[in-house]
Structure formats: C-alpha cells, structure tokens
Amino acid sequence: MIKELVSDEAVLSTPCAAATADDAPVAQDLVDTLKSLDDAACLAANQIGETKAIVAYLDDADEAHVLYNPKVLFGMGAFKAEESCLTREGIAKVNRFVKIKVAFDELVDGELKPRKRDFVEWEAELIQHMCDHCKGKLI
C-alpha cells in the first residue's frame, strides 16, 4: 500500500527497532511507496511512519531491494557528499564511503536470513543514507 511520507522530526529522529519477519507488510508498503515516487531512489521505514529498521532502494534497472536490519560493518574511500532527502528540506553535507560492507537480513520463505554484501559508489551512498535514517540521524 502506498503511504504518505512523514516529515515529523520526532518520528525521523527515533532510532528504529529491529525488524522481524512479521514486518513484511511494512517492507511491502515501503517498496510500493518508493515505486510511486518520481525521482526517488531509496526509503527507510521511518519515512512512512514505521520505526522499524527496514530500507528499500532501487537499483540501476529500477528493481526494488529490501534490507532488514542493515548495518554498515566498514567502509573504504571516505569522501564528502551533498545529499538531499525526501522527508527533509535542503541539502546536507555528510561523510560517506565509496565502498561499504553491510550486514543485513533478507526475507526468504517467510524467515529472515542473515546476509553480507559489498556496495559501491551510488548504491553505497544510498545504503549509508538509509542506515542513518534507521539510527534516527536527521540528514
């Protein structure tokens, strides 16, 4: 279901609780909402009012991917970036990495399975932005 975006700082600044397999409907709402937005590349669940650690992003082929409980384990190639956000006004200057390794859970057959994956460049920046949202960091 497509949800309205939330810009309430009280919601966005609240660290997200760990997600479970029972949160699959939240993940689906996140994907539906992301796909409905023009020029959007990623969303975190708190941006649709759900304080669960779930993020979704679109790859270069516009295919949606969902990460439950994402955590950046380490990064390489630090750089300064200027980012905008769908639920915040203005541009924020942030520190990012060109390459990151992320631990996350993936929903497989109704169960969360632990995964690790490397992300580079644009996808790495998106994931870092979404992980900041999960921590309640306002960008």
Regions found by a protein language model. Give the residues of each.
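Positively charged
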Residues: 1-139
